[in-house]
């Protein structure tokens, strides 16, 4: 079973079409990975679906880096899925 970090990286690579090597913990979705506002919304939706969680808009706005996503999902995922 993939770790949360591995799964998050996989989703980012698929959604943004970036190289896996670019997806580092401190990589900003917008500044480093070239995401626009629509991309970030789609990323959050993909995280919600993959990890079976609900991410409120006010929390989604705070998820700006790979580490932010991993930390949020780790704290909120049901049963670590």
From Swiss-Prot:
<dbReference type="GO" id="GO:0000036">
    <property type="term" value="F:acyl carrier activity"/>
</dbReference>
<dbReference type="InterPro" id="IPR006162">
    <property type="entry name" value="Ppantetheine_attach_site"/>
</dbReference>
<dbReference type="GO" id="GO:0005829">
    <property type="term" value="C:cytosol"/>
</dbReference>
<dbReference type="GO" id="GO:0009245">
    <property type="term" value="P:lipid A biosynthetic process"/>
</dbReference>
<dbReference type="InterPro" id="IPR003231">
    <property type="entry name" value="ACP"/>
</dbReference>
<keyword id="KW-0444">Lipid biosynthesis</keyword>
<keyword id="KW-0963">Cytoplasm</keyword>
<protein>
    <recommendedName>
        <fullName>Acyl carrier protein</fullName>
    </recommendedName>
</protein>
<comment type="similarity">
    <text>Belongs to the acyl carrier protein (ACP) family.</text>
</comment>
<feature type="modified residue" description="O-(pantetheine 4'-phosphoryl)serine">
    <location>
        <position position="37"/>
    </location>
</feature>
<keyword id="KW-0597">Phosphoprotein</keyword>
<dbReference type="InterPro" id="IPR020806">
    <property type="entry name" value="PKS_PP-bd"/>
</dbReference>
<keyword id="KW-0276">Fatty acid metabolism</keyword>
<comment type="pathway">
    <text>Lipid metabolism; fatty acid biosynthesis.</text>
</comment>
<dbReference type="GO" id="GO:0031177">
    <property type="term" value="F:phosphopantetheine binding"/>
</dbReference>
<comment type="function">
    <text>Carrier of the growing fatty acid chain in fatty acid biosynthesis.</text>
</comment>
<dbReference type="InterPro" id="IPR036736">
    <property type="entry name" value="ACP-like_sf"/>
</dbReference>
<dbReference type="GO" id="GO:0000035">
    <property type="term" value="F:acyl binding"/>
</dbReference>
<dbReference type="InterPro" id="IPR009081">
    <property type="entry name" value="PP-bd_ACP"/>
</dbReference>
<dbReference type="GO" id="GO:0016020">
    <property type="term" value="C:membrane"/>
</dbReference>
<keyword id="KW-0596">Phosphopantetheine</keyword>
<dbReference type="Pfam" id="PF00550">
    <property type="entry name" value="PP-binding"/>
</dbReference>
<keyword id="KW-0275">Fatty acid biosynthesis</keyword>
<feature type="domain" description="Carrier">
    <location>
        <begin position="2"/>
        <end position="77"/>
    </location>
</feature>
<keyword id="KW-0443">Lipid metabolism</keyword>
